[in-house]
């Protein structure tokens, strides 16, 4: 869902379909966030070829949610309400599933009996721990399945470490990307001069005034060439010493 990548795909002839009515014929590619199972079933019923590109880590959340439902748990999804990944998870989590974004949301829920938690893959471990602490005293049984993506956790930890060593941080990635926004917030907590950009053209010289060490990292949906391409030379031309965060492998 990176805006630049979506634009490049459109230029290559791949159109973005908001729903199946926009894809009357041909092949439908399910994006990494996944969808509710009814969408895939409906696509096949219409004779469309379905290429399921759902992230394997997201599929693990679907499987975990379905297992909790079978075992009699009410499922709570820790994540961003309305986010495409979360909407897809809800399709596997039973009719009484709900979404909480933080501990305060959990406090407002009416809970009883057996509750099972799954997590949007790009959430922080800290947020999960806070939600668990809020729910635990209020239920008979709580089962937590930590479905945070390992690569996401590693990237968040590395970004925090990098931000602590830098005078300025640049986060590259879509403004609509949940995991990129979380990276930006994590970096901002450690480095006041943190800037979230989608393209190198957004860089401003004033950001790097008196900055001796400049850190750069990116969200999971940002292609490596968008970091290695125009961004690094522009930052170096501002006179800063660049520290780049290596990308952890997913899996």
Please place each PLM-identified region on the residue numbering:
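The feature marks the mature, well-folded catalytic cores of soluble enzymes
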Residues: 1-220, 224-251
